[in-house]
């Protein structure tokens, strides 16, 4: 009986220690990313679908990107570099003019005309 209790205790410790260590490697960050439409949302979230990222959501209304990731696999700096490489400014880095020029015309968030067009489009549909 004593042997059985010892084996159970060892098993509990063996399973508890690895899971405890993993949870300390998980972090969630939120940061601003410029964009204006659903295409931007798809592009931003797809770009951050990388090894180590567990969850990503970019909110069109607030422009806040929330990322949950493993700190032992990827860094927050990688997110900013990845997004600027595909043409989206973040609160820490600005996309190059070359990268920005490659995004679709309706996604040109630096243009006041495009921003206004998306505001008009949003205001004209139902909010049920």
Where in the sequence are the language-model features?
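The N-terminal extracellular segments of secreted preproproteins, especially immediately downstream
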Residues: 10, 36-39, 105-106
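General secretory precursor processing signal
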Residues: 14, 40-43, 109-110
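Processing junctions and N-termini across compartments
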Residues: 15, 31-34, 100-101
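N-terminal targeting signals for Sec/Tat export/insertion, comprising classic cleavable signal peptides
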Residues: 28-57, 61-62
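Mid-chain, structured segments of secreted extracytoplasmic proteins
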Residues: 60-108
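Histidine-centered metal-binding segments
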Residues: 106-128
